[in-house]
């Protein structure tokens, strides 16, 4: 039996950002990301590649101010695309978990695509105050927006490390691997005793 490809496109135009993206869950890790913020491009590329997704994303934002609007709006669009592509979430494994080392750094990501948005953000004392020219809080806000739009319970824990780039890379790869597990089709029904994920 042939299954329908899970895919979604999202466009968002505001006074702060103009975003267009297409996400394919059953992809080959083909990723093209251009946001104007190189570190965000790098982390999104890692997440999509490790998830096995195809992602084509462009964003033109008010980077003359800072990267905050760009990061948050990209996260909202990415989460919306994931939620749309998963539709009623019927048949997915739903839960994913990964720990990924990057040199001296280790992060853990656990998620449940449950329909109940939540972000638990731990260990950010290991992150330096500024990474790639932006305050570290930008990354918490990115993940919060993503979890909210995807209707996902997302826990990100930085367990140890010193280099901000390494810590972010560890978490981004972990998010990709956890998503790969959670979106896997492994049954015909919704994995919930209440019969729905909302």
UniProtKB/Swiss-Prot annotation:
GO cellular component: cytoplasm
InterPro entries for the chain: IGPD_sf, ImidazoleglycerolP_deHydtase, ImidazoleglycerP_deHydtase_CS, Ribosomal_Su5_D2-typ_SF
Pfam family membership, one: IGPD
Known EC number: 4.2.1.19
GO terms classed as biological process: L-histidine biosynthetic process
Any one GO molecular function term: imidazoleglycerol-phosphate dehydratase activity
Family of the protein in this entry: Belongs to the imidazoleglycerol-phosphate dehydratase family.
Localization annotation: Cytoplasm
Keyword Membrane belongs to the record: no
Keywords of this entry: Amino-acid biosynthesis, Cytoplasm, Histidine biosynthesis, Lyase
CDD domains referenced in this protein's UniProt entry, alphabetically: IGPD
Protein name: Imidazoleglycerol-phosphate dehydratase
Species whose genome carries this gene: Nitratidesulfovibrio vulgaris (strain ATCC 29579 / DSM 644 / CCUG 34227 / NCIMB 8303 / VKM B-1760 / Hildenborough) (Desulfovibrio vulgaris)
Pathway where it operates: Amino-acid biosynthesis; L-histidine biosynthesis; L-histidine from 5-phospho-alpha-D-ribose 1-diphosphate: step 6/9
Reactions performed catalytically: D-erythro-1-(imidazol-4-yl)glycerol 3-phosphate = 3-(imidazol-4-yl)-2-oxopropyl phosphate + H2O
Highest taxon, organism lineage: Bacteria
């Amino acid at each position: 039996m042939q299954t329908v490809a899970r895919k979604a496109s999202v466009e968002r135009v505001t006074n702060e950002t103009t975003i267009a993206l297409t996400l394919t869950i059953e992809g080959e890790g083909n990723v093209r990301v251009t946001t104007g913020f190189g570190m965000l491009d790098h982390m999104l590329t890692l997440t999509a590649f490790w998830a096995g997704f195809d992602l084509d994303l462009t964003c033109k934002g008010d980077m003359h101010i800072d990267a905050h609007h760009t990061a948050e709006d990209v996260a909202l669009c990415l989460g919306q695309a994931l939620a749309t592509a998963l539709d009623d979430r019927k048949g997915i494994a739903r839960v994913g978990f990964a720990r990924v080392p990057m040199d001296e750094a280790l992060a853990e990501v656990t998620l449940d695509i449950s329909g109940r948005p939540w972000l638990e953000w731990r260990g950010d004392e290991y992150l330096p105050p500024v990474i790639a020219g932006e305050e570290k809080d930008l990354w918490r806000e990115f993940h919060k927006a993503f979890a909210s739009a995807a209707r996902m319970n997302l826990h990100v824990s930085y367990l140890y490390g010193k280099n901000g780039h390494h810590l972010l890379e560890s978490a981004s790869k972990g998010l990709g691997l956890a998503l790969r597990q959670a979106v896997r089709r492994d049954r015909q029904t919704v994995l919930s005793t209440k019969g729905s994920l909302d």
